[in-house]
Regions:
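Surface-exposed coil loops of outer-membrane beta-barrel proteins
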Residues: 33-39, 80-95, 106-226, 281-312
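Short, solvent-exposed loop/turn segments at secondary-structure junctions
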Residues: 74, 119, 276
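Sec-dependent signal peptide hydrophobic core
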Residues: 9-13
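Long, well-ordered mid-to-C-terminal structural blocks that present hydrophobic/aromatic surfaces
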Residues: 250-292
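Positively charged n-region of N-terminal signal peptides that target proteins for export
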Residues: 1-8
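Hydrophobic h-region of N-terminal signal peptides that target proteins for export
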Residues: 14-22
Length: 386
């Protein structure tokens, strides 16, 4: 009897595995990025080739609940003088998540994510990366609320780099000279509580973030964000947000962002403004968590000690070609004495040759008050999915 039960269990397991694999989806992508960057008269080559593979196993008939994994390999050659190593090989686990949806009523649902998946704060500029954790979200017509917690110490710092608080004695552990495919990242525990209340065509957003530092610096960061977004008219939207950050409750800094977008058929025109505090009055320098550079200058510039005002236009031609252009003015706000820092522009196009093949060309240039910061970047990007 016991042998028959084992055989039955084995047969059922094989049938279940076969059905699961038959229902599974898979695919991949190849990217080739050829970049020339540096001083206008001495551009240097930066070559980046990547291959990624993904697999998805549905766990429900509607395909809203699923298991998803994505791995990638990148080869990078960087001839710039600022590069510590010319050649880098990078292996990464981009996604490894279980995603589940439960419909609670015709107008409400519950979502649970577990594993490694990307997430971003409300501004999209402070914490925008993957991490290993849990995300629980409840959404209805009257309210949306979520909780989040994760750990960053198992990430590959060659892919996701977090900014250290050097004043607290911690340096980034990303060492580009290493031959390792995978270098463990800085250790933080991000936690978050998010609330969104829709009313008419508007949204009120309230977020609280904490980043518990498990590195030697023990510099814990806490953020509170308040935002409003929605439509002023049928074709005009806005998004206004401000965030206050404290480090170990010993300092206060601010990051504020405003955006207006006008939609006219296939054309979008956007105006934006950004303030990231420096040593301005009672404010300390604002330091985001994820490394992200808004200025195209020769020296990396984070969202800290700057004021940026910009305009951007996007035009879609026959749903095949997207043409875009934008320009920004940057003010140096690292001290109380505000000073003009520079002007930058970006322009390019995305051409969908086929549904699974895209060619992009992008030009970016920064003109600084200090000419040592001047930089030109030219990119040709080929992306293919299969």
């Amino acid at each position: 009897m016991e042998i028959k039960m084992k055989k039955s269990f084995l047969i059922c397991s094989l049938i279940f595995l076969s059905l699961t694999l038959n229902a599974a989806e898979w695919g991949g992508a190849f990217s080739n990025v050829t970049e020339f960057a540096g001083k206008t008269e001495e551009l240097k080559l930066v070559q980046n080739d990547g291959l990624s593979l993904w697999g998805k196993i549905p766990c429900s008939k509607d395909n809203n609940s699923y298991l998803l994994a994505d791995v990638s390999y990148n080869f990078k050659y960087d001839a710039q003088d600022s590069a510590n190593r010319a050649v880098n090989n990078i292996l990464n686990l981009n996604l490894f998540e279980a995603n589940f949806y439960w419909k609670l009523s015709p107008f409400s649902r519950l979502q649970l994510k577990a594993g490694r998946f990307p997430i971003a704060d409300g501004t999209g500029s402070i914490f925008t990366q993957s991490a290993d954790g849990l995300y629980l979200n409840f959404k209805s017509l009257k309210i949306e609320a979520s909780v989040y917690g994760s750990y960053t110490g198992l990430l590959n710092s060659k892919v996701v780099e977090m900014l250290p608080l050097e004043d607290f004695g911690y340096k980034s552990n990303y060492i580009e000279e290493t031959n390792d495919f995978y270098t463990l990242s800085a250790k933080y525990i991000p936690v978050a509580l998010n609330l969104r209340i829709p009313f008419r065509a508007q949204n009120f957003v309230l977020q609280g973030w904490g980043f518990l530092d498990l590195n030697e610096s023990n510099a814990n960061r806490f953020l509170a964000t308040v935002g409003f977004n929605g439509y002023i008219s049928k074709n005009l939207s806005y998004n206004v947000q401000t965030s206050f950050q404290t480090v170990n409750f010993a300092s206060i800094s601010n990051f504020s962002k405003v955006n207006f977008s006008l939609y006219v058929e296939n054309f979008i025109l956007s105006l934006k403004g950004i303030y990231a505090s420096g040593n301005n009055g009672s404010f300390s320098p604002f330091i985001p968590v994820t490394k992200k550079t808004p200025v195209f200058s020769f020296y990396d510039t984070e969202y800290s000690g700057l004021i940026l005002a910009g305009i951007e236009a996007n035009y879609l031609v026959k749903k095949i070609v997207n043409v875009f252009a934008g320009a920004d003015f940057i003010i140096d706000a690292r001290t109380e004495n505000l000073d003009y820092r520079g002007f930058q522009y970006a322009a390019g196009l995305n051409y969908n040759i086929f549904p699974d093949l895209r060619l992009s060309a992008i030009a970016k240039q920064f003109f600084g008050k200090n000419t040592e910061e001047n930089k030109l970047t030219l990119d040709i990007v080929l992306q293919m999915v299969f």
